[in-house]
Regions:
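N-terminal beta-propeller domains
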Residues: 1-52, 163, 167-265
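Small/polar beta-strand repeat architecture
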Residues: 46-151, 159-164, 172, 181-193
Length: 266
């Protein structure tokens, strides 16, 4: 088994957390941390950060008070502090924001212990902070292991039987967004109502393929050729397809694997 590398603490290690790969190309890859209704991003072995804030002052007190005008932080936000200047005792690492006001805040470690700067050397300059980049998701920690996904360039299609189909789009390292796409349908069974959300997804021969809703666990939906959100069926070669497995037992489709053929597992 290949070795692993420690990249950072998850947001809450008491909850189930899952890493999902996102690869635009071999030289541009990410690890996505899915936890309890949030997503964080790792790139090149580091946590992706939001905008950097410059610290203009740090008091010698318990707890030490940091000044950064209009910083925008809230209590409980996790930030990475970079220290390349004085007050060397304040190490470059992750902290939690506490005591937040418009222009000032204090810090605790990740266990909630306040950072006491009383005996630290005097601050001069060289300290910045940046919030750990995070996006809200609909998936709870109890659901993340049942999330399935398929990616095309900068867009990932994500499914879970309890949630509407989502897209996850990337426009920059710290610019990701979830959306509920508009799906065109003209036939039943549908994909866009409660108990009709798919559980499995893949790409196959220029089509986006969904499968296994709660109401139709053995049905597959193939999009129109090269038109991934169009599930309009018809008689043309490139129209969408809806296919239900004929079987003596109604075993739900559990996975789809696209190779030279489409492998379907129950």
């Amino acid at each position: 088994r290949p070795g692993t590398e420690y990249l950072g603490e998850v947001k809450n290690s008491s909850n189930v957390t899952r890493l999902i790969p996102f690869e635009f190309k071999t030289s541009d890859t990410y690890a996505l941390e899915f936890g309890n209704q949030y997503m964080r991003v790792f790139r090149n072995g580091l946590q992706v950060l939001s905008a950097t804030k410059t610290i203009s002052a740090i008091t010698k007190a318990n707890p030490g008070v940091l000044t950064s005008n209009s910083h925008g932080y809230s209590n409980g936000d996790e930030v990475y502090l970079e220290n390349s200047g004085a007050m060397a005792e304040l190490k470059s690492r992750n902290y939690l924001v506490a005591g937040s006001s418009t222009n000032t805040f204090t810090l605790t470690d990740l266990y909630g212990v306040a950072i006491n700067t009383t005996s630290f050397t005097t601050f001069d300059s060289g300290v910045t902070t940046a919030k750990i980049y995070e996006v809200a998701t609909p998936y709870t920690s109890a659901q993340v292991n049942d999330v399935r996904f398929a990616q095309s360039a900068d867009v990932m299609y994500i499914v879970h039987p309890s949630h509407a189909i989502r897209t996850l789009s990337r426009t920059d390292h710290n610019a990701w967004s979830f959306a509920t796409p508009s799906i065109t349908e003209n036939n039943t069974p549908v994909l866009t109502t409660s108990d009709n959300y798919p559980s499995v997804v893949t790409f196959f021969e220029q089509r986006l393929v969904f499968a296994a809703t709660n109401n139709n666990p053995q049905t597959l939906w193939f999009s129109k050729n090269a038109d991934y959100l169009n599930f309009t069926t018809g008689t043309a070669d490139d129209n969408a397809l809806i296919y239900t497995i004929a079987s003596n037992k109604v075993n739900a489709i559990r996975y789809l694997s696209a190779t030279r053929i489409l492998n379907i597992g129950t």
